[in-house]
Amino acid sequence: MTLWASRLIVCAWPIVILALASFRLDLMSFKVPLLAVALGVLLAAIGIVLLILGLLLGAFKGQATLSSGVAVIYFIAAFIIVAPAIQTIMVGASVPPIHDITTDPDDPPIFAHVPSIRKASDNSLELDAGVIDQQRKAYPDLAALILSQSKAEAMILVADTATAMGWEIVRRDEEQGQLEAVAQTMIFGFKDDIIVRIREADGGTRVDVRSASRVGVSDLGANAARIKAYMAALQEAVQ
């Protein structure tokens, strides 16, 4: 039993690595690598169960199967694959299945350049009432940022903060007060599109942000977290 456990765990690693690499290198759409990762996670999870059962059975029969050191190594190797998957499932259950978030649901910023760099198979950028309603309930604290700076000064701060966060700026329109950028997630390399809009308001400026994932049904809260982090960094830059 422990032999099968070790084989499954060893097989899981190349499956996951190749799946991640194929997507990051843009060799195929995200669905196939995602299924491959799920397969790797399943193999690792079964490996953990068989490993534990094998060790318990060996101890009960008084027969040595694997040394404790080797067993720990296999367990850690499998846990590294399984743990993120468990965390993802837990996070996914706690947030709505949406992937387009904005600080202004009444009048969301409209992408101008991003549609030209998206694939036809990517998520739509049309926001319907159902998505807006789910966002209001899930992220009631998401709001615009009011600055005392002029529109030109705010644009400099907005662009500098976006660059500091590692975003790739793909459009900067001083006259319209808009900046579009692309952010990439660490592990899978998913690309999310962001637009920052600056409008004059009450003697200063109002900054709104919209972040939308190109693929997937749920963003697992990533877009809302990105917007909050950006707004916090922007506010800190002003002080």
Role assignments for model-derived ranges:
Residues 63-92:
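Internal/C-terminal transmembrane anchor helices
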